[in-house]
Design a protein with these regions (language model features):
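Acidic, His- and aromatic-enriched active-site or binding-groove loops in soluble protein domains
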Residues: 87-105, 212-223
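Generic long, charged, amphipathic alpha-helical segments
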Residues: 461-515
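Charged, low-complexity intrinsically disordered tails and linkers
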Residues: 1-28, 113-145, 258-263, 459
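Short acidic loop-to-helix transition motifs that present clustered carboxylates
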Residues: 75-79, 323-326, 507-514
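TRNA-binding/sensing appendages of the translation machinery
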Residues: 1-98, 161-200, 299-300
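Extended, low-hydrophobicity, polar/charged segments
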Residues: 54, 111-119, 144-160, 165-441, ...
């Protein structure tokens, strides 16, 4: 292709609205343009990269026996109502009505629709197992779209679904996807980690996320350098570090003391000259319309994901100030578990074994000393705290680290959540009706591109891996008016094409510096510069990564790039 014929609208400055590196460079390099909040047009270069990513995904999905389909993005409400997710998805789902006032939605994922297809067609164990997939546009009504292609309202996703007769079959399908995802992300040139994850609204018994460490990410991954343990922050477990000072010994009786105007854990710690870890934190939640008291160590945070997993199907929220006042007779900041009999109390495991701690007295401006779980109040104990950097690994005792990350893929063992609720049945070998077991597996196509840019860039632009760059090589004559340079450049370009390289000839009538800056900006892995060294039969080969430059013979230029690019 000739650059002079292409639409590549590069920018010299970072757009003001772009905060993360990938967003800045995608705009500056002319890959994307914003239509509305969270909605982008993919221009020529972006489309080339995204198609390459999709091709890699297709090849690896086909290799595990998955069959590509294409399902409707416009879904009737009743299908989502069957699974119960019409209400669960809330404001995240785009909803609309047709001219007959029937409810519809734009699909965010396709578990329900795939199950409908299976329900209508699968009859016998002889038709299983099945793996079906699609690469399709999805829609999610994000409250605050941001970070370019990382949090959008319209996006491309590869979603696949497995149907098996039993748990062993699901385990095999899950393992196939796990390995296929590793091959996909390896081929795309990403550095990633597969971590244990929470299934959330998807449901199911097990899931893994594939994460790329990046400050642009909105997820957090907990890792242990000692044993390799890794998990999403929502799922991670740990041993908290010991309290900052030992608890007072003895069987002491709770006693109130005046804490005027001290409402926060930090304020009480300063007032008492005791560390936050010597206090109990009281949180009031409303679960299915009823109050619940949650107790944590003062320096710990509640994991709402863990609480939700413990609560099961209960819907919960934080209590409002007026509700707290009605139930406790005091305001938040003065609450505690002693004397509470009218609601369930849940305590985090970190409070087990602790003695004589400080808690609210359920009286404004007062707290209690000497509060002990199991003696002064009873509670149901669970792992409810959010892991923090510096905690200890439960497997090996090493210190845990927490890193912001970008989620690029997620796989789930769904179990029977959808097949059971939506009435999918087949006959087994004995002629008995049984319910198939399902898995669900997703990859964010644009997220792969954004993650690659976050990983690989410098002050001059993107440094894209060859497998997903829009072009493998750009051939750049330094002086368009030099006939010898143009002839050699066209010859090298033609040889690159013949070797199967995606080549671009920069035939624009621009200064060499402009051409070089644009090539660096858009992330082409190799540049062949045809300049003054042509008189000696040589051209410059510049590798975008590290800017390493070597002189090669004109006749060897195309073959050298092909060898380095793995063609």
């Amino acid at each position: 292709m000739l650059w002079s014929h292409l639409f590549i609208p590069t920018l010299r400055e970072n757009p003001a609205e772009a905060e993360v590196i990938s967003h800045q460079l995608l705009l500056r390099a002319g890959y994307i343009r914003q239509l509305s909040a969270g909605i982008y047009s993919y221009l020529f270069l972006a489309q080339r990269s995204l198609l390459k990513i999709q091709q890699i995904v297709r090849q690896e999905m086909n290799a595990i026996g998955a069959q590509e389909m294409f399902l409707p993005a416009l879904n009737p409400a009743e299908v989502w109502q069957e699974s119960g997710r019409w209400d669960i998805m809330g404001d995240n789902m785009f909803r609309l009505k047709d001219r007959f006032q029937r409810d519809l939605c734009l699909g965010m994922t396709h578990e329900e629709i795939m199950t409908v297809v299976a329900r209508g067609e699968l009859r016998s164990y002889k038709q299983l197992p099945q793996i079906w997939y699609q690469i399709q546009t999805k829609f999610r009504d994000e409250a605050r779209p941001k970070s370019g292609l990382l949090r959008v309202r319209q996006f491309l996703m590869k979603d696949s679904y497995s149907f098996d007769m039993d748990q062993a079959g699901l385990d095999a399908a899950y393992e196939k996807h796990y390995k296929a995802y590793c091959r996909i992300f390896d081929r795309c040139g990403l550095r990633y980690t597969a971590v244990e994850a929470h299934s959330g609204a998807m449901g199911g018994s097990q899931s893994h996320e594939f994460m790329v460490a990046s400050d642009a990410g909105e997820d957090f991954v907990v890792t242990c350098a000692g044993c390799g343990y890794s998990a999403n922050l929502e799922k991670a477990v740990s041993r908290p570090v010991a309290p900052d000072r030992p608890d007072p010994e003895g069987d002491l009786t709770p006693e109130p003391f005046h804490t005027p105007g001290r409402k926060t854990i930090a304020e009480v710690a300063e007032f008492t000259a005791l560390p936050e870890s010597s206090q109990m934190k009281s949180l009031v939640l409303v679960a299915d319309g009823k109050p619940v008291l949650v107790m944590l160590r003062g320096d710990h945070q509640l994991s709402e994901t863990k609480f939700g997993a413990m609560a099961g199907d209960m819907e919960f929220r934080q209590a409002h100030p007026e509700e707290i006042r009605t139930w406790f007779g005091a305001d938040a900041g003065s609450l505690g578990p002693v004397g509470i009999k009218n609601m369930p109390i849940y305590a985090d495991r970190a409070l087990e074994g602790r003695r004589n701690m400080i808690a609210g007295a359920n009286r404004n401006d007062y707290h209690l000393r000497n509060v002990t779980l199991g003696e002064d109040f009873e509670a149901e104990v669970h792992d409810l705290r959010q892991v923090a950097a510096g905690d200890l690994c439960t497997r090996c005792g090493s210190t845990l680290a927490v890193q912001k990350s970008i989620e690029i893929g997620h796989i789930f063992k769904l179990g029977y959540k959808y097949s059971e609720s939506m009435g999918l049945r087949v006959l087994n070998a004995e002629g008995k009706e049984v319910t198939p077991i399902m898995g669900s597996y997703g990859i964010g196509i644009e997220r792969i591109l954004s993650a690659a840019i976050e990983l690989y860039h410098d002050k001059d632009g993107m440094i894209l891996p060859s497998a997903i760059a829009p072009f493998d090589v750009v051939v750049t004559p330094a002086n368009n008016s030099d006939e010898a340079q143009m002839t050699a450049a066209r010859r090298i370009y033609d040889e690159c094409i013949a070797l199967g390289l995606d080549a671009l000839l920069d035939d624009r009538d621009e200064r060499p510096g402009v051409k070089f800056k644009d090539a660096d900006l858009i992330g082409i892995p190799y540049r062949i510069t045809v300049g003054k060294k042509l008189a000696g039969g040589m051209v410059e080969l510049v590798e975008r990564k590290g800017k390493a430059t070597v002189d090669v013979l004109v006749a060897e230029a195309a073959r050298t790039v092909a060898a380095r690019a793995g063609r």
